[in-house]
Design a protein with these regions (language model features):
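Positively charged n-region of N-terminal signal peptides that target proteins for export
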Residues: 1-4
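Bacterial N-terminal signal peptides
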Residues: 7-16
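A short, N-terminal "cap"/entry segment at the start of jelly-roll beta-barrel domains
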Residues: 19-95, 188-196, 200-206
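His/acidic/aromatic-lined binding-pocket segments of jelly-roll/cupin-type domains
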Residues: 92, 98-102, 147-148, 155-156
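Short, conserved beta-strand element in jelly-roll/cupin
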Residues: 95-114, 125-138
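Short alpha-helix capping/helix-loop boundary micro-motifs
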Residues: 140-145
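Conserved metal-binding segment of the jelly-roll/cupin
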Residues: 148-169
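A short hydrophobic beta-strand segment most commonly corresponding to one strand
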Residues: 171-187
Length: 206
């Protein structure tokens, strides 16, 4: 019996050594985010951001900004009210941050395209530039843009440098936004910072 136990222990130790060697083998691909934890954002927290948007008349809010090794990933919640026609200089474009929208509620018309007319640099002091989506431009129109009718459940992918322009919002639209920031131009935001943000009035651009 003792011999069997010793053999089993030796096998276990050998297996552990083999696994460790496999992990540190320099010829193997290595994780781009070594020993990074996973992250969870509950629905209740996302709903708190939507409630805050309605109460304080906010549009875009950053819920998290997470380090994943070679990039930052931002999670935002956006609420937009009714829009009969687009405002002047309302095309948006971000130089380094790509965005993915998942529509939660409402309907709207969104135009996408890279050819933006009358580009104007967004101020570097702007809150969204500093904390949400980094440097970029606004513009008047998107030349040869493609329009999409958005509804709940839809997903939109907007690469960095692509113009995006809400031209009509029927009543309102709420969506969750994932921001991909490979150059890490936006600051990190954790759960504790999110709770602190939700506990008091939101900062605004001066």
């Amino acid at each position: 019996m003792r011999t069997i136990i010793l053999v089993c222990s030796a096998v276990a130790v050998t297996a552990a050594v083999v696994i460790a060697q496999q992990r540190i083998n320099p010829t193997d691909p290595q994780p781009t985010c070594a020993m990074c934890p996973g992250y969870y954002v509950p629905l209740s927290e996302l709903q708190a951001y939507t409630k805050k948007a309605l109460t304080e008349r906010l549009l875009d809010q950053q819920v998290r900004d997470i380090e994943i090794g070679k990039a930052h990933i931002g999670i935002g919640m956006v609420h937009r009210g009714k829009l009969d026609a687009p405002g002047a200089n309302s095309v948006a474009e971000h130089d380094q941050v790509s965005e993915v929208y998942h529509i939660i509620e409402g309907t709207a018309t969104l135009m996408l395209g890279p050819d933006i007319t009358n580009r104007q640099r967004r101020p570097s002091t702007q809150l969204t530039v500093r904390e949400f989506n980094g440097p970029g431009n606004n513009g008047d129109q998107i030349r040869n843009g493609v329009s999409y009718q958005l509804k709940a459940g839809d997903v939109v992918v907007i690469p960095a440098g692509t113009g995006h322009w809400f031209t009509k919002i029927d009543d309102h639209i709420d969506y969750l936004m994932v921001r991909i920031d490979p150059d890490k131009v936006t600051p990190l935001k954790n759960e504790a910072q999110s709770k602190e943000y939700l506990s008091k009035p939101a900062p605004r651009d001066q």
